[in-house]
């Protein structure tokens, strides 16, 4: 490169010194020098990737029907498409967890579903709330059978254990602030 502020000629072109160029002209000049260096080395100094046009053939206009046999272009059932999408995107675990809540009655039976409902599912532990302590006790006894029914419906590993609770007991706490009192008293005697 020339360090002076004089113009010089290179290959028939008059080249301005770098000190007089600024902004876009300086960038354009650097690009031209890089292209010239690439051409001097025998490389293709392209102006970006250009896809050659594909010649148009008359056969491209003909419609390709799927024919009498099954084809990937045939209409698919919505359930199959949704299942394939969930599997492809890695949503299978979340969909299985949602099925526990959505199909609770069909998984455990109508009688149990009338008296207990799922509340949450965290790390494979399904929290179930029963409408009475008697139903909570009965569900704790049936816990192994419930886990087997759930695993048969949504697959193994989705629900690993059950946390069964009864209805909440009445609370005497009032307001957002609480100071520890003297403990429970005999209020019913």
From Swiss-Prot:
For this protein, the record's Pfam families field holds: DciA (PF05258)
For the region Disordered, give the residue spans.
59-78
At the top level, the lineage of the source is Bacteria
Under InterPro entries, the record lists: DciA-like, UPF0232_actinobac
PANTHER family referenced in this protein's UniProt entry, alphabetically? UPF0232 PROTEIN SCO3875
Tell me which family the UniProt entry assigns to this protein: Belongs to the UPF0232 family.
The identity of this protein, by name, is UPF0232 protein ML0004
Species for this entry:
Mycobacterium leprae (strain TN)
């Amino acid at each position: 490169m020339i360090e002076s502020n004089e113009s010089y000629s290179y290959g028939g072109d008059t080249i301005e010194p770098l000190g007089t160029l600024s902004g876009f002209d300086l960038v354009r000049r650097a690009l031209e020098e890089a292209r010239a260096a690439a051409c001097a080395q025998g490389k293709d100094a392209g102006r970006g990737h250009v896809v050659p046009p594909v010649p148009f053939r008359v056969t491209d206009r003909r419609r390709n029907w799927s024919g009498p046999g099954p084809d990937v272009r045939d209409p698919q059932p919505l359930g199959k498409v949704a299942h394939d999408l969930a599997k492809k995107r890695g949503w299978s675990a979340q969909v299985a967890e949602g099925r526990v809540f959505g199909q609770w009655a069909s998984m455990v039976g109508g009688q149990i579903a009338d008296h207990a409902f799922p509340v949450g599912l965290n790390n494979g532990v399904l929290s179930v709330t029963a409408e009475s302590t008697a139903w909570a006790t009965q569900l704790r006894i049936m816990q192994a059978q419930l886990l087997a029914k759930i695993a048969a419906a949504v697959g193994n590993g989705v629900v690993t254990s059950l946390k069964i609770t009864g209805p909440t007991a009445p609370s005497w706490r009032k307001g957002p602030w609480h100071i520890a009192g003297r403990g429970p008293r005999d209020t019913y005697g």
